[in-house]
Amino acid sequence: MTKKYSLGFVGRKAGMSRVFTEDGRSVPVTLIEATPNRIAQIKTVEVDGYSAVQITVGARRAALVNKPAAGHFAKAKVEAGRGLWEFRVEDAQLGDFAVGGEIKADIFEVGQKVDVQGVTKGKGFQGTIKRYNFRMGDATHGNSLSHRAPGSLGQRQTPGRVFPGKKMSGHMGAVQQSTQNLEVVKVDVERGLIAIRGAVPGAAGGDVIVRPASKA
């Protein structure tokens, strides 16, 4: 089965709000800052081995842009952004894009299902209760040491080791995560906003990638 590729959009999570429907229902939404994505490069099968659209968004001070990146942006005649992202597209779609052009929020429609990818909030080093929802030990009844202990890590001399993947204390959060099949509630191109029903990964101010849902 041939995989179908589709164009996405890079925005910034602004925070959460709510909108009211015509019948008075309150719908919780996440607001995404959707400033136009600038096309920095078109990748083709002949040159790069695959078809993709490379975009940038936002702005970055010239002092923070190294020479290779500055040359890349200058060649495309686009302002240096805060990063570069790529979206694989079908070969037949490449004719719809041009280097230096813009992709706006109107590629999405109200009611459309989307997948949103972001970096989750970092929680630092956490124990198994917070990290994996382990059950706590008894608060009293003779328990004086193991209130938040994870319990056994394995067996005995055989196998004599802790199996890989064992749930233990460690760094929590700050990983890429996708939330699938969220509904687009509103698209405001003039104000540069997309309202998506429900929560999306990450903290306010973080970059998120919005794509048409892969399982809709």
Swiss-Prot record:
Signal peptide start-end: none
UniProt subunit comment: Part of the 50S ribosomal subunit. Forms a cluster with proteins L14 and L19.
Biological processes per GO annotation: translation
Similarity-based family: Belongs to the universal ribosomal protein uL3 family.
Name of protein: Large ribosomal subunit protein uL3
Modified residues (N5-methylglutamine): 157
Role this protein plays: One of the primary rRNA binding proteins, it binds directly near the 3'-end of the 23S rRNA, where it nucleates assembly of the 50S subunit.
Single GO term (MF): rRNA binding
Pfam families: Ribosomal_L3
InterPro entries per record: Ribosomal_uL3, Ribosomal_uL3_bac/org-type, Ribosomal_uL3_CS, Transl_B-barrel_sf
GO cellular component: cytosolic large ribosomal subunit
Maturation and modification: Methylated by PrmB.
Coiled coil segments of this chain: none
Organism: Xanthomonas campestris pv. campestris (strain ATCC 33913 / DSM 3586 / NCPPB 528 / LMG 568 / P 25)
Record keywords, A-Z: Methylation, Ribonucleoprotein, Ribosomal protein, RNA-binding, rRNA-binding
